Amino acid sequence: MNDENLANSSDVPSIPGKYLRVLALAGVAALGLALGTASAQTIVDEWANVKTPPAPELKPVTIDSKTTALLMLDFMIHNCGKRPRCIASLPAVKKFLDEARAKGMLVVYATVPKGNIADTLKEVAPTGSEPIVSSGPDKFINTDLEKILKDKGIKSVITIGTAAHGAVLFTASAAGLRGWNVIVPVDGMSSDPYTEQYTAWHLANAPVLSARVTLTRFDLVKF
């Protein structure tokens, strides 16, 4: 029997078309899996090659001192002392705090859990009449902060403090997601440079939150 006859012989089993299609699809899937495995990268793998996004815009802000509260977050000696930018920012923070008080703005202080308000840096220490709450990074959790703000008819909050990636990020986010307008002077939040950078980027770009947050500087804020 020659090759042609062999090819036409009924002794050679045929493969139904549907099975051929299944085999073809399986082959494509296997190839895709192999290529995907070879090229898959995580953000950690690509870390060194990620390009820094453009800096967010700092905007001028005019505030109503009657409906705006200044949140002074974790300006504790042990927090600020280990962050050089926090120490360097104190004169500007004090000047802004003095201006806010002079305009009759509500000022609320926050400390870390079990923190002692007496450990607040003396340059920016609270007066006897200013409310104080104590919590972790999100100062709304297990505190009266939300009630304090609502009872005073507050519509906007200014969040400053240390650390930028701790109390400022979490409290600003919590305020925005609760419906308050949030103003963040970037020269009033402190940590190390990278964490300040990603905090500013997150606040300016996060879904929902970005519509509530305005990044600014102390000198761009008008009372």
Segments (PLM) and residue ranges:
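Active-site-adjacent betaalpha module
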Residues: 2, 40-69, 114-223
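Short acidic, Gly/Ser-rich segments with clustered Asp/Glu that frequently serve as metal-coordination loops
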Residues: 76-81
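Bacterial N-terminal signal peptides
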Residues: 23-34
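Bacterial N-terminal signal peptides that target proteins for export
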Residues: 3-25
